[in-house]
Every structure is written in structure tokens, then in C-alpha cells.
Amino acid sequence: RGTHGIGIKATNAMSKRFTVWTCWKGDWWCIEYRDAALHKEPYKSKPPKLPHGLKAKRGTVVMFEPDLSLFHKGTKMQLSSAKEWSKLTSYLVKGMTVKLTNSSGETREYVSEGPATFVHDKIAELKATQTGKTFLYSSKELDVALAFADVEGSHVAAYTNGLRNVEGGEHVTACIDSLVRSLKPYL
């Protein structure tokens, strides 16, 4: 998390088994890796059986078994990190459902109406009141949700390929510069 270009590749590299199923045009396809190397080329398959016993009906399912030799004894992924990632991912893809199953078999679903829900929830988290409507823009390349609220400071968050640009970077700079240029004539 947090570094561009490594997400799924790093997970595969650090896994004993890494399997991805996806439903494409009504058919399930699967690709398998073992110890970070291709084990089976993509092939038609049955829907994967999920940890909670249900069969997936559509979408993409990723399952992996970490290579424990790469981790310190007792290393675990914190459930709070998995919850945060699941919630964030649902914000970034409108209508996508992310299901997180914990070690007890309990499943929580995260689904949202996209970036607008992220903005709404962030304003609520800050205990602020929104002033005006949320500006929304969506294209193939870009999604923008922008709102003003009665809160101190700036709370700008940028994401690229599902990963947060923690230090802002050019995405945030370009957004703020464009906003300032467009509002300047009205100040």
C-alpha cells in the first residue's frame, strides 16, 4: 500500500500461492502463480468458492497464501488496515462491492456511490457542515469530487490506480492550481 505500481505484483511476489479469477462475458477465467512464477496460463474455470462458502457470481476474486518465510514470526495484517483499504476501494469505484472476510468467517461488505460518498463521509468525519453542492466530474481518465465545508485547512486526497498519493504530488498540485485559477476572477 502507498507505493505506485507494486500492489498486486508485490502480493504475488510475497505469496506461496496466488490465484485470480475473473468473470468475463459470462465465463469464469483463472490464472495461477506459485512462488511468484506462473503456474497455469489463464484457463476457463468454475466460479471460485469463497471463504464463507458462497460461490462468486461475477467480478474478480483474488486469493493468496503469504510466503511466511518472508515475514517475521507472528506478523499479521491488521484488520483495521484491511477494513480501511476495503472502504477506500469501494469509494474509488462507484457501485463496486468489496467483501472482507475475517478469520472468524464474518463478512463485511463495503459499497458506495463513488467519490461523492468519500467526500460526504470525510465531511462527517471532520464534524463539518458542507457549504453548497458537491462538484462531480467523471471521465474515462479521471474522477473528481469537490466540496467546501466550514472546517479549518485543506483536506485534499488524491489517488492513482487505487493508491493514495500520501505526499500529494502533481495530482494534488494540479487540482489546487486549477481550482485557484478558476475561482480567482470571483475573489
Show which residues each predicted segment covers.
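GHKL-type ATPase core
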Residues: 1-124
